[in-house]
From Swiss-Prot:
Family label: Belongs to the NPC2 family.
Assembly behavior: Monomer.
Gene, per the UniProt record: npc-2
Species this chain originates from: Neurospora crassa (strain ATCC 24698 / 74-OR23-1A / CBS 708.71 / DSM 1257 / FGSC 987)
S-S bonds: none
CDD domains, alphabetized: PG-PI_TP
Described purpose of this protein according to its UniProt entry: Catalyzes the intermembrane transfer of phosphatidylglycerol and phosphatidylinositol.
Protein name as catalogued: Phosphatidylglycerol/phosphatidylinositol transfer protein
Amino acid sequence: MRLSAAVIALLSTSAAAFSVYRENSVSANDELDVPGKSPLRFCDAAADRKDDIVTIEEVILTPNPPEAGQTLTIEASGIVKEAIEEGAYVNLQVKYGYIRLINTSADLCKEMKNVELECPIKKGRLSITKNVELPKEIPPGKYTVEADVYNSDDKHITCLTATVFFGRKTLGFLDDL
C-alpha cells in the first residue's frame, strides 16, 4: 500500500508515479509521453489536458528502469493551477496482464499523508523528490497502472498511465550460458 500511496500522491501534486520497462529505459517521444526519463504516459491528448488542474513538466525515475528490491527515486515537477483540497480523489486501476488487481477510488489527501504530503496543495510551481523502496518479491509479468485524479468538485486534476514489466531474477553466471 505504501507504493500505491506514493503513486497516488505524486500523481496528484505534480503528478508522478512509477512504471517499469524491464528491457529499456524510456524517454518522452510523443504527445502522450510524460516529459523526462520515465515511461509514464498521459491518458489524454494535449488538447484534452489543457484544463487539467496540474500541468506536469517532467518526471525522472532513477534507476530507469527500476528493479525489484531497489530504491526508486521519483523526481517530478509541474504547475498546480488551483489548490487541491480535502475531498480530492483518485480512481486507481492496476492490472497484472489481463487480471484486474485493484479497481478503487481513494481519498487523495488521506493517501498523500502516507508519503509525507498534505492537503491543501497550494497553487503554483511544485517540485517533488520521493524515494520508494520496491519490494524484492514482485511477481514477474506485465502490470498496467492508471490513475485518474479529480478534485472535490469533480474537476479533472490529471490522468496518467504506465505499463510495468518485471522480469524473473536470474543468477548472473547463468546469463552467459
